[in-house]
Amino acid sequence: MPSALAFVLLVLNISLLKGQSPPGKPEIHKCRSPDKETFTCWWNPGTDGGLPTNYSLTYSKEGEKTTYECPDYKTSGPNSCFFSKQYTSIWKIYIITVNATNQMGSSSSDPLYVDVTYIVEPEPPRNLTLEVKQLKDKKTYLWVKWSPPTITDVKTGWFTMEYEIRLKPEEAEEWEIHFTGHQTQFKVFDLYPGQKYLVQTRCKPDHGYWSRWSQESSVEMPNDFTLKDTTVWIIVAILSAVICLIMVWAVALKGYSMMTCIFPPVPGPKIKGFDTHLLEKGKSEELLSALGCQDFPPTSDCEDLLVEFLEVDDNEDERLMPSHSKEYPGQGVKPTHLDPDSDSGHGSYDSHSLLSEKCEEPQAYPPTLHIPEITEKPENPEANIPPTVDPQSTNPNFHVDAPKSSTWPLLPGQHMPRSPYHSVADVCKLAGSPVNTLDSFLDKAEENVLKLSKALETGEEEVAEQKGAKSFPSDKQNTPWPLLQEKSPTVYVKPPDYVEIHKVNKDGVLSLFPKQRENNQTEKPGVPETSKEYAKVSGITDNNILVLVPDSRAQNTALLEESAKKAPPSFEADQSEKDLASFTATSSNRRLQLGRLDYLDPTCFMHSFH
């Protein structure tokens, strides 16, 4: 035994020294079936060990213990085994192994499980055809057609094949692949005209592998730049050139830049016929003449007017001395109508809805009346003597000759002279002064009004003599009236009784009652028996001027009657009071006739106190 073992080891050592060894492990490459009826398997042999090596393929079917050897080693080439229809079963799984054997030993590959249904790899499609066609709109395309592999039964439905094509320009490197599905034709659009294209195709069953690419087929795309396209491009070029020429011509003609033509500035507002160059040069006269204007329109200084009125001129004949007859004062006065077409506004005073804008022109202020000192004493020491007035004291300005007033239109016979007292502050000052001074002021204003009225009448001297004879009796030469008449125009005459403001109700109505004076002393007024509200407050101006409007004609008449009853019965004042009462009655009549007015002109009040 030991000698035999030693001999074997000696042989092995000799073999190793010569470079011989057992074969290497072979590897099965793939198994493919072209039509599910036959299939072929290929392997890669290992090292042979320096000795001749024999390769064999054995297989067994799933569920069987019998091992089979490859039926055909020659049909499919070296290192392959072909299974014909006789040895192929599509519903069986094959377990395939490759064995390598030489003198030094043997080796086997890893087993491969094969299902003929999933190892199908068909042959490439055949009859590949390329055609260039043209649509109705003269657009060209490439039409590719092919046929299925020959050994594949596609018509009976035994196989369902899918196809792919690829193409590229002849000089390109990358292929453009298109999947066509189950179709055996395909249209390729948008190919470059004048280029030569190479096309190939392949197929694959439902459960298998892609076949090899077919042989290359080539086609050259025609140059489809037709005459129609050339004409279109020529027209486009001509139009572009014309547009460019028009733009250049417009820029050169107008002298504007290209940017101004493309992006014109936003135009500003303009007045038709308005020359901005004249305005910039400051030539206003030329600008106005271009606009058709002679000069700048006159500016108005009536912005501070409280109310806009219709301007009405007073008739000068309405300020005449009223008649001393027993008839109602003012009945004998017949005003003279002015021209209705004059600028005074009498032409439209019958319209109660028409108002004109008033813009008063500056009026000359009436002369301020001053009361001189009376140094002579009357013969009757008990008579009322007007007190000495301080020349530095402020006396009211009586605006007795104002020719205009702004109010609603009235009838010619209803125009009234304006009262000289309009300022509440001045009235309060007069009320606080002695009674004789206040009486002198009032008498003086009333006589001035009478004198102006007398001067307007024709035959002024005759009328003055008649009125003097009626006013002053000849048997009373020792009264103060002749003395005051000779001294100055400021004659002391006891005026009619005046009224005081008793209260102002919520509606702005003043309650007035007569003020009693006896023995040159002002008595405190008592509560009147019946207070008659006859005036309303129409408004208060900026100078604290209270604007009064007569409420009714009957109330004023009643107040005049009460004042006449309470007047003292002295003979010296009878004639003067008759004259003044006649004037007051005339004024009252004028005021009563204005009962329809709703307001007075505040601007007229303001002028009398300047």
Curated annotation (Swiss-Prot):
Q: Binding residues for Zn(2+), per the UniProt record?
A: D206, H207
- UniProt lists compositionally biased (Low complexity) regions at 345-354
The record's section on SUPFAM superfamilies has: Fibronectin type III
* GO cellular component terms listed in the entry, alphabetical order: cell surface; external side of plasma membrane; plasma membrane; receptor complex
Q: Which Pfam families does this UniProt record tie to the protein?
A: EpoR_lig-bind, fn3
**Could you confirm whether the keyword Zinc appears in this record?**
yes
Residues on the membrane's Cytoplasmic side span 254-610
Signal sequence extent: 1-19
Glycosylation sites (chain numbering): N54, N99, N127
| Membrane-spanning parts | 230-253
> Where does the record place it?
Membrane
Q: Where is this region: Disordered?
A: 317-355, 458-482, 564-584
Segments carrying motif WSXWS motif = 210-214
Annotated motif Box 1 motif: location in the chain? 262-270
Q: Name one GO biological process term.
A: cellular response to granulocyte macrophage colony-stimulating factor stimulus
Q: Where is the composition biased (Basic and acidic residues)?
A: 318-327
Q: Which residues form a coiled coil?
A: none
**Positions of the Fibronectin type-III domain:** 22-122, 124-224
Q: What does this protein do?
A: This is a receptor for the anterior pituitary hormone prolactin.
Please quote what the entry notes about the protein's domains.
Answer: The WSXWS motif appears to be necessary for proper protein folding and thereby efficient intracellular transport and cell-surface receptor binding. The box 1 motif is required for JAK interaction and/or activation.
Q: How does it assemble?
A: Interacts with SMARCA1. Interacts with NEK3 and VAV2 and this interaction is prolactin-dependent.
Q: Which family does it belong to?
A: Belongs to the type I cytokine receptor family. Type 1 subfamily.
Q: What is this protein called?
A: Prolactin receptor
Organism source for this protein?
Answer: Rattus norvegicus (Rat)
